[in-house]
């Protein structure tokens, strides 16, 4: 990957810990990483057990002054961010710099809605979990422990998908017209095409 290039990952369908481990390694190596659709991240194990674990974590606080921490994030993006932070030496300068190279989002906000998103096969739920194993959605867990924007994120995602469908339809139409135009002019420019091919400009 070129220096300064941003790696945009789609979190949907990935396992929380596995994706976090890979992201942590990449940011330590100096790459900028953006993770979108964090609400679609999966956690292995059934939902009820995961919820009990998170509720137990919510009870961890400083008795004399809870505002001093630990801080319990409710948004899926922040839960994922905290998971990555736990895999970094975040109290050192190197770890802090690595953490600054990571951006996390619920849904797919602009400008990332127009960028190509990648997946990490080593962290995909369909690759890593047996089909019979239970799993939970991070978005649902977050919603049940206090995240208020599940409905808003879902609405914005629907709007984005509709826009993407329209854009894809237009793109297909343009490609069809281009092919037709090439066919129409093929006989006229045939000899020029042959010359370009002999010189290696066309394959």
Curated annotation (Swiss-Prot):
Keyword Kinase appears in the UniProt entry: no
Disulfide bond sites: none
Modified residues (N6-acetyllysine): 191
Keyword Zinc-finger in annotation: no
GO BP of this protein: cellular response to type II interferon; homeostatic process; lung morphogenesis; macrophage chemotaxis; negative regulation of formation of translation preinitiation complex; negative regulation of translation; response to lipopolysaccharide; translation
Residue ranges the record marks as coiled coil: none
PTM description: Phosphorylation at Ser-77 upon interferon-gamma treatment in macrophages involves a DAPK1-DAPK3 kinase cascade and is causing release from the ribosome, association with the GAIT complex and subsequent involvement in transcript-selective translation inhibition. Citrullinated by PADI4.
Modified residues (N-acetylalanine): 2
Residues that bear Citrulline: 59, 140
InterPro entries for the chain: Ribosomal_uL13, Ribosomal_uL13_CS, Ribosomal_uL13_euk/arc, Ribosomal_uL13_sf
Chief localization: cytoplasm
Keywords associated with the record: Acetylation, Citrullination, Cytoplasm, Phosphoprotein, Ribonucleoprotein, Ribosomal protein, Translation regulation
GO cellular component terms, A-Z: cytosolic large ribosomal subunit; GAIT complex; ribosome; synapse
Family matches, as Pfam families: Ribosomal_L13 (PF00572)
A GO MF term: mRNA binding
SUPFAM superfamilies on file: Ribosomal protein L13
HAMAP family documented for this protein: Ribosomal_uL13
Subunit structure as annotated in this protein's UniProt entry: Component of the 60S ribosome. Component of the GAIT complex. Interacts with EIF4G1.
Record family assignment: Belongs to the universal ribosomal protein uL13 family.
Protein name per the record: Large ribosomal subunit protein uL13
Organism, as annotated: Bos taurus
């Amino acid at each position: 990957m070129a220096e300064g290039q941003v790696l945009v990952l789609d979190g949907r369908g990935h396992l929380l810990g596995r994706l976090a481990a890979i992201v942590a390694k990449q940011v330590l190596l100096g790459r900028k990483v953006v993770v979108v659709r964090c609400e679609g991240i999966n956690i292995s194990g059934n939902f009820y057990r995961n919820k009990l674990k998170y509720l137990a974590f919510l009870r961890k606080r400083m008795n004399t002054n809870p505002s001093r921490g630990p801080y319990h994030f409710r948004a899926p993006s922040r839960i994922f961010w905290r998971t990555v932070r736990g895999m970094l030496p975040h109290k050192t300068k190197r770890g802090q710099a690595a953490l600054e190279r990571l951006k996390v989002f619920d849904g797919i906000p602009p400008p990332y809605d127009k960028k190509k998103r990648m997946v990490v096969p080593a962290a995909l739920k369909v690759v890593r979990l047996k089909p019979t194993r239970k799993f939970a959605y991070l978005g649902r867990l977050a919603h049940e422990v206090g995240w208020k924007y599940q409905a808003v994120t879902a609405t914005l995602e629907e709007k984005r998908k509709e826009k993407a469908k329209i854009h894809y339809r237009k793109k297909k139409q343009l490609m069809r017209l281009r092919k037709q135009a090439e066919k129409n002019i093929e006989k006229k420019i045939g000899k020029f095409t042959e010359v370009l091919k002999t010189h290696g400009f066309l394959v």
